[in-house]
């Protein structure tokens, strides 16, 4: 009898399991399916129940789950992947720019730029209150600051506030009307600390020339007309549609407590500094939020542990909102690398200025801040572009790891210059490299605005994806949209080839496509703190997936770049399909 009871119990359990698994409401068969599960990366078929993955396997294994009520889709060999995840996207800012005047990093003559400004003034795309603003400006323009002044401080523009915003969103140029509105003049500049003076371009006589970077740009951004709540909700809806069309079903917003026009680089948050969080809440309440958003709160780089209480009061205002999580904080360790901004923090000085950029964090206390966040179970996501900023960011995380092994995954984003001594530190510190590898290109940015100004060693290890990977680092995909396109397939192809208009940017740092497929799925899910729910097609995880128009494992890099999404599914429901496919 003792042997009979276990046998009966096991049969009952098996029968119950079959019953539970027999209620698939959606089955997709005959596919080329990438699961992003390292234990079982490729399968033929997928079963979905109540918005979650029920099972994956062969056609034969999954067909037994089909009932009369089950919707069955024959993929006919098409490729299916998990929904893609962007580990660094300012999506609502991007949504605003979709409907606004934008140069898209294109360079044209000042005559043509002025012509476009007139056109955007007439159609309203450049108008924000009484200010004319154009986004997406190439950093190559900033060497012409004085020519901009001659053009846009007189004639028809003499009384019109104008701002040209860099595609990097760290730099801008403002005319005299706008500078006056922001209170920026020679007198102000002379009262600023030396580091902050360097964030405002100056003429020989000490007057501002209109060029702004980081904290200098904050001063002008703070007096720009604010977008209305309705405008922001429309921007969020546009961003959601656009991301879904690219196969993106989750992203991490790294500055969710800062709204457009609010200072970011010198942010001193209060419990009322809620940024775009109310917009995400409103979007969720419409029932149409077809993406997971992990919203980070920007902490001032010089914050102390007690300051986290203020951010926690913000977090508590936005709990239990479907598809919105608040997993941690974002910190700026430095600025940007390109000439003339050069605010990224370097180990060796810039060749022209002999300065080392601006390290925004305080190395003596940064570890205390990271450790305090880690103790709360918060992930820390750090903007670090220069090699010194990367080193000090790792040092801060190292302090947290010495204090405890929390299991919280922290990340460093951008990683434009990384000293080789840092490569082997990422894995043992459990730090993910959140990289915008679309930027790994031999172009005017890397060759004209960076190479002449940094050491040969620093330049050699620019966006060093392969070197990091070789030392065991985990890479997550990221775009920094609207700084550049959020299209993951563009970034995947670029990470492989590193080809640009001026050649190849250190071909040795190229990585393979499968690494990039994991970077935009399970690795990115870890980065944003949602790896238990999304990122791979495994039983119990949410059924977020995409179907694409080609076999991304076999096509060449050009074809990979041009991949189109045929449909995007969120929680087992189709949320995007082009008009015809």
Where are these regions (language model features)?
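Bacterial N-terminal signal peptides that target proteins for export
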Residues: 1-8
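N-terminal signal peptide c-region/cleavage motif recognized by signal peptidases
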Residues: 17-19
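Divalent metal-binding segments
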Residues: 23-29, 34, 38-312, 327, ...
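Active-site neighborhood of phospho(di)ester-bond hydrolases with catalytic His/Asp-centered motifs
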Residues: 81-87, 413-414, 434, 476-479
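Conserved beta-strand positions in the central sheet of alpha/beta enzyme cores
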Residues: 252, 330, 413, 434-435, ...
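Short, conserved secondary-structure transition motifs
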Residues: 300-304, 413-422
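His/Asp/Glu-enriched, well-ordered alpha-helical/loop segment
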Residues: 371-381, 385-410, 420, 424, ...
């Amino acid at each position: 009898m003792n042997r009979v009871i276990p046998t009966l119990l096991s049969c009952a359990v098996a029968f119950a399991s079959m019953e539970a698994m027999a209620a698939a409401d959606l089955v997709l068969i005959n596919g080329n399916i990438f699961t992003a599960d390292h234990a079982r990366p490729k399968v033929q078929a997928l079963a979905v129940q109540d918005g979650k993955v029920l099972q994956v396997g062969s056609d034969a294994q999954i067909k037994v789950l089909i009932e009369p009520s089950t919707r069955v889709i024959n993929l006919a060999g098409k490729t299916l992947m998990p929904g893609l995840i962007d580990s660094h996207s300012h999506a609502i800012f991007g949504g605003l720019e979709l409907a606004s005047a934008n140069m898209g990093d294109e360079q044209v003559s000042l005559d043509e730029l002025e012509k476009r400004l007139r056109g955007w003034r007439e159609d309203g795309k450049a108008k924000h209150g009484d200010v004319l603003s154009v986004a997406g400006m190439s950093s190559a323009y900033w060497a012409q600051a004085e020519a901009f002044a001659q053009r846009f401080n007189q004639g028809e523009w003499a009384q019109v506030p104008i701002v040209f915003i860099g595609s990097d969103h760290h730099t801008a140029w403002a005319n005299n009307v706008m500078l006056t509105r922001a209170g920026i003049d020679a007198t102000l500049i002379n009262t600023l600390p030396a580091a902050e003076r360097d964030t405002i371009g100056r003429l020989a006589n000490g007057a501002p020339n209109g060029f702004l970077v980081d904290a200098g740009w904050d001063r002008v951004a703070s007096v720009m007309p604010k977008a209305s709540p309705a405008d922001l909700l429309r921007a969020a809806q546009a961003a959601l549609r656009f991301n879904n069309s690219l196969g993106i079903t989750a992203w991490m917003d790294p500055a969710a407590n800062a709204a457009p026009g609010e200072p970011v680089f010198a942010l001193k948050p209060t419990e009322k500094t809620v940024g775009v969080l109310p917009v995400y809440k409103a979007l969720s309440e419409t029932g149409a939020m077809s993406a997971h958003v992990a919203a980070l709160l920007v902490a001032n780089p010089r914050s102390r542990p007690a300051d986290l209480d203020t951010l926690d009061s913000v977090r508590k205002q936005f709990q239990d909102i479907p598809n919105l999580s608040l997993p941690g904080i974002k910190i700026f360790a430095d600025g940007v690398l390109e000439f003339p901004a050069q605010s990224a923090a370097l180990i060796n000085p810039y060749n022209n200025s002999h300065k080392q950029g601006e390290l925004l964090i305080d190395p003596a206390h940064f570890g205390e801040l990271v450790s305090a966040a880690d103790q709360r179970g918060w992930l820390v996501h750090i903007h670090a572009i220069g090699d010194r900023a990367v080193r000090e960011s790792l040092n801060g995380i190292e302090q947290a790891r010495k204090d405890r092994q929390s299991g919280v995954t922290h990340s460093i984003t951008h990683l434009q210059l990384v000293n080789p001594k840092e490569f082997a530190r990422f894995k043992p510190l459990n730090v993910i490299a959140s990289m915008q590898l679309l930027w790994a290109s031999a172009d005017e940015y890397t060759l004209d605005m960076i190479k002449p100004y940094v050491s040969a060693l620093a330049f050699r290890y620019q966006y060093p994806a392969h070197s990091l990977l070789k030392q065991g680092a985990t890479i997550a995909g990221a775009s920094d949209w609207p700084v550049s396109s959020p299209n993951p397939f563009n970034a995947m192809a670029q990470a492989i080839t590193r080809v640009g208009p001026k050649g190849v940017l250190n071909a040795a740092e190229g990585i393979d496509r499968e690494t990039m497929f994991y970077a935009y799925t399970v690795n990115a899910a870890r980065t944003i703190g949602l790896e238990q729910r999304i990122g791979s097609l495994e039983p119990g995880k949410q059924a977020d997936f995409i179907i694409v128009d080609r076999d991304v494992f076999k096509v060449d890099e050009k074809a990979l770049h041009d991949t189109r999404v045929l449909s995007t599914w969120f929680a087992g429901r189709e949320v995007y399909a082009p008009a015809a496919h």
